[in-house]
UniProtKB/Swiss-Prot annotation:
One of its GO terms (molecular function) is catalytic activity. Keywords: 4Fe-4S, Iron, Iron-sulfur, Metal-binding, S-adenosyl-L-methionine. S-adenosyl-L-methionine binds at G171, E172, M236, L237, S238. The keyword DNA-binding does not apply. It holds the Pfam family Radical_SAM. InterPro entries: Aldolase_TIM (IPR013785), Elp3/MiaA/NifB-like_rSAM (IPR006638), MJ0103-like (IPR040088), rSAM (IPR007197), TRAM_dom (IPR002792). Belongs to the radical SAM superfamily. This is Uncharacterized protein MJ0103. It comes from Methanocaldococcus jannaschii (strain ATCC 43067 / DSM 2661 / JAL-1 / JCM 10045 / NBRC 100440) (Methanococcus jannaschii). Binds 1 [4Fe-4S] cluster. The cluster is coordinated with 3 cysteines and an exchangeable S-adenosyl-L-methionine. The lineage of its organism: Archaea, Methanobacteriati, Methanobacteriota, Methanomada group, Methanococci.
Length: 433
């Protein structure tokens, strides 16, 4: 008898079965079903027992692993968003798309997007994320080793000095698995040049154990989204009845007592959460007064601000709450300046109007642009897109978003001519010619 122990594979995080169908949890938040077509197989938890002649048993073992690999490549589904998830690995480039991979904007900060998909359904989401999205048709997950390999290439290109890896994306970054390994790998690379790793999060996935592990892995800062303290308002903004603001505040205080810098990032939705926005600011200031952190950002030689106030903007495929008023940044900064003055009169110095320089962000060598806007080029279509009417093509070590397509599935595998519409920050958008 030959045994196949599925628990030895890191990406397989849970195993169930229904008769001869394996139901595998992949990287915590994904799932596949694999029908095992062999009579000689007995499934016992994560152990598959193969009762056959040794040579036949080894062939069956290889066959089962091939079926699992095929299912991950073609039938992966998110348990969070219920969408098909495309597993990204070599040879798909990781530069060119906003939904996954790496984004480099000619600065010392590199945005790391290991996956997309969110466990909340925020009413203001700029990318229409969550289970009830009306525009997103596919999610993506990037293989950890492939992500790190490509990240290191960009860091080396920038000569590895004062680099910040920032985990963000179209979704909740902390849902990526293995998150701790990702942070540790990034931190190991960046610390050679006095760099850091930071992460955006809505906080819902975090717990004491995970925070301890992220601290040990070398995470420098958590940008924690808190948009209201009122329980009813917080649930409404998040689009989830089970959103627990008390749990988020408890997590905030736990982070504050760790070696990870806490930055609270409230979002103002004018005419919706104006009062709650101010309350979140007050909460953050009080927390800093009671428990000041002394964590120094090596990029600046100073402490990071406690607050990163943001203004809700309207985006083409994003959500816009009906009652929300649209403000420009001049009006927003005027409001923040007013709040700063109020604190100054109380003898409290609070920085609410922040800039990238406050976090050590500065210009650095930019990756070359392989395409010019208006250029016509040939592209190999390799994957279905993130939204309806989009497919993904590959050319010159870039992934290209080809928009306004019909019959997307018929294009996959073909070489097509496209016209480049956008190349800013190496985010490449094109249309068929």
């Amino acid at each position: 008898m030959v045994c196949l122990d599925l628990s030895q594979y890191r990406m397989i995080t849970d195993v169930k079965n229904k008769d001869n169908t394996l139901i595998l949890e992949i990287n915590k938040i994904y799932e596949i079903e694999v029908e095992i077509p062999y009579e000689e197989v007995e499934i016992d938890g994560s152990i598959i027992k193969i009762n056959a002649h040794p040579k036949r048993a080894e062939n069956i073992k290889v066959g089962i692993l091939n079926l699992i690999s095929y299912s991950i490549a073609n039938n992966l589904k998110s348990k969070i968003t219920k969408r098909k998830t495309i597993y990204i690995n070599e040879p798909i480039p990781l530069i060119g798309h906003t939904a996954f991979g790496l984004i480099e904007r000619g600065r010392n900060i590199i945005q790391v997007r290991g996956h997309c998909g969110c466990n909340l359904n925020c009413i203001f989401c700029s990318v229409d994320e969550g289970e009830f999205s009306k525009t997103r048709k596919n999610d993506y997950y990037v293989d950890l080793e492939y992500l790190i390999e490509n990240y290191k290439k960009i860091v080396d290109f920038k000569e590895n000095k004062f680099i910040e890896a920032h985990l963000d994306g179209q979704g909740e970054p902390s849902l990526y698995y293995p998150l701790v390994d990702l942070v540790q790998e990034l931190a190991e690379i960046n610390k050679k040049g006095n760099g850091i790793v930071s992460m955006q999060t809505n906080g819902t996935v975090l717990n004491y154990k995970l925070i301890d592990e992220l601290e040990e892995a070398g995470l420098h800062r958590i940008n924690l989204s808190i948009n209201a303290l009122d329980e009813k308002m917080a649930k409404m903004l998040s689009g989830r009845r089970d959103y627990n603001i008390k749990k988020i505040l408890d997590i905030a205080e736990y982070i504050k007592n760790s070696k990870i810098h806490l930055l609270i990032a409230p979002l103002l939705l004018p005419n919706i959460n104006d009062e709650e926005f101010k309350r979140v600011i007050e909460y953050a200031v009080d927390l800093e007064q009671k428990n000041p952190q002394n964590i120094i950002n090596p990029l600046t030689g100073k402490k990071d601000p406690i607050l990163g106030c943001q203004l809700c903007r309207v985006y083409q495929l994003g959500r816009r709450p009906k009652k929300m008023k649209v403000w420009d940044f001049e009006k927003f900064y005027y409001l923040l300046g007013k709040y700063e003055l109020e604190y100054k009169k109380k003898g409290i110095e609070v920085k609410l109007i922040t800039s990238p320089k406050d976090f050590g962000t500065h210009k650095r060598k930019r990756l070359p642009y392989p395409f010019k806007v208006g250029e016509v080029t040939k592209v190999k279509v390799v994957l279905d897109g993130r939204v309806k009417g989009e497919v993904l093509g590959v050319a010159k070590d870039r992934v290209i978003q080809i928009i306004n397509c019909n019959n997307e599935q018929n294009l996959i595998g073909k070489t097509v001519k496209v016209r480049i519409l956008r190349n800013k920050d190496n985010i490449i958008v094109a249309e068929l010619v």
